[in-house]
């Protein structure tokens, strides 16, 4: 429910009760950040509506490749909280973003890439502990994410050498001009799709068919 993230949590609940859908992706961030009380309310709504939930992990101020260990400790506390909430909500999976370059990345060539891989391995272990699947999303240009294109993901999957799913964000891959390339390269890894549209230049999150994606 990213489109209503700027609305109060109570508005999200109202929209959920009225939504004519079977599947909902919750965003654990901003005004919709979860706690026990909110999880209980979402669980009640989900059971009454017959929803299947997935969850988007926090992404504001979250960088799994942060070079400072204390910063990563904060990141992992937030992500582990999401895993706990996802378990309670019986979410099918959690979507998370890859790490990002920082203002000091150029001083330590390759360090953020290494930390990103190590962090994903740690997340995979946590996900197994909580019995909740996780999947990593392709992110858009021009932002400093470490994983945006097919070539980067190919290197990442080879180095990680673990079974992890890919969330294909079609809007993001459209900006990179690689939607078909992602599907051809990683068809066996794609476990979830974010379907939205744009002009091929900006991450506009338009409705399907309202941009340049060749659906």
What are these regions (language model features)?
Residues 1-5, 27-31, 58-60, 99-101, ...:
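Active-site beta-loop-alpha junctions enriched in small/polar residues
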Residues 1-87:
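N-terminal pre-domain/capping segments
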Residues 51-56, 95-97, 188-198:
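Non-cysteine beta-strand/loop elements that form the S-adenosyl-L-methionine
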């Amino acid at each position: 429910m990213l489109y209503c993230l700027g609305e109060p949590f109570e508005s999200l609940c109202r929209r959920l009760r009225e939504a004519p859908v079977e599947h909902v992706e919750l965003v654990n961030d901003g005004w919709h950040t979860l706690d026990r009380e909110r999880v209980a309310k979402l669980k009640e709504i989900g059971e009454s509506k017959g929803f299947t939930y997935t969850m988007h992990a926090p992404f504001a101020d979250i960088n799994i490749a942060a070079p400072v260990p204390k910063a990563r400790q904060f990141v992992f506390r937030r992500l582990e909280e999401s895993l706990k909430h996802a378990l309670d909500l019986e979410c099918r999976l959690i979507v998370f973003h890859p790490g990002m370059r920082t203002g000091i990345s150029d001083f330590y060539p390759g360090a953020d890439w290494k930390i990103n891989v190590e962090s994903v391995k740690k997340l995979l272990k946590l996900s197994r502990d909580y019995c909740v699947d996780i999947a990593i999303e392709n992110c858009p240009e021009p932002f400093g994410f470490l994983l945006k294109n097919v070539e980067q993901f190919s290197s990442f999957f080879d180095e990680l050498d673990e079974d992890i799913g890919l969330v294909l964000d079609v809007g993001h891959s459209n900006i990179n001009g690689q939607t078909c390339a992602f599907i051809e390269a990683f068809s066996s890894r794609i476990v979830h799709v974010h379907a939205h549209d744009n002009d091929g230049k900006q991450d506009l999150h338009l409705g399907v068919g309202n941009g340049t994606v060749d659906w």
